[in-house]
Regions:
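Hydrophobic beta-strand positions in extracellular immunoglobulin-like domains
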Residues: 9-10, 37, 126, 140-141, ...
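Fold-core signature of tandem repeat domains
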Residues: 10, 25, 55-57, 136, ...
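Short, solvent-exposed, Trp/other aromatic-anchored flexible loops in extracytoplasmic proteins
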Residues: 15-71, 146-189
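Short beta-strand elements
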Residues: 68-89, 190
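Low-complexity, acidic Ser/Thr/Pro/Gly-rich terminal tails and inter-domain linkers that flank the onset
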Residues: 84-116
Length: 190
């Protein structure tokens, strides 16, 4: 059986980001590969030195994606030693809009921007304050009074935070005559 080795979740200093690893290994063979962090989050929000890298690996049959994984493991790597690990703490800004901040989760709207690929984007900061994985989703979303679902979902590992964007494509906004965004209403669930 050929196995696929992948990273399901990656964190740097408690900030969830995208660690990319997808390596197939044929029966009886070995492979060396690297995990790439393809995420501007680490630079855009000054995460600092990588003092605590959390990785959740999953190994599964390449030819049967519906089969249960043959291995799932999570590890932490402390490049400077575990005693030097630093957890990221985001400082609030005057432009923040706190949507929710309770014992379970925190969601903060940081602002908006236009992205050439994703379209109109609401930038958010989210924290999972629990010891279980949370799925953040949006419901009943409207732009300028027109229903416009961004089809948003973000799975956030226990005790981590992340920066993300909730986006609407140009075509979605054009269909709803909402090229100029004046108001957005939505329910965010975790």
């Amino acid at each position: 059986v050929t196995y696929m080795y992948s990273v399901d979740t990656a964190t740097v200093n408690g900030v969830q980001c995208y660690g990319v690893l997808a390596t197939e290994v044929a029966p009886g063979k070995k492979a060396n590969d690297e995990i790439s962090f393809m995420d501007s989050i680490l630079e855009d929000y000054d995460i600092g030195n990588f003092t605590d890298v959390g990785l959740s690996f999953r190994v599964y049959d390449t030819d049967d994606w519906s089969a249960d994984p043959v291995a799932e493991e999570s590890v932490h790597v402390y490049p400077y030693g575990e005693d030097k690990a630093v957890k990221y703490e985001r400082e609030p800004e005057s432009t923040d809009t706190v949507v929710v901040d309770n014992d379970t989760a925190k969601v903060v709207i940081l602002g908006t921007e236009y992205d050439d690929i994703w379209g109109y984007t609401v930038k958010v900061y989210m924290e999972n304050k629990t010891d279980r994985t949370l799925m953040f989703t949006t419901e009943e979303t409207s732009v300028n009074g027109y229903m416009a679902d961004p089809y948003y979902a973000m799975e956030l590992a226990p005790g981590t935070c992340t920066f993300d964007g909730i986006s609407w494509s140009d075509s979605t906004l054009e269909e709803n005559k909402s090229e100029e965004v004046e108001s957005i209403e939505m329910i965010i669930r975790a």
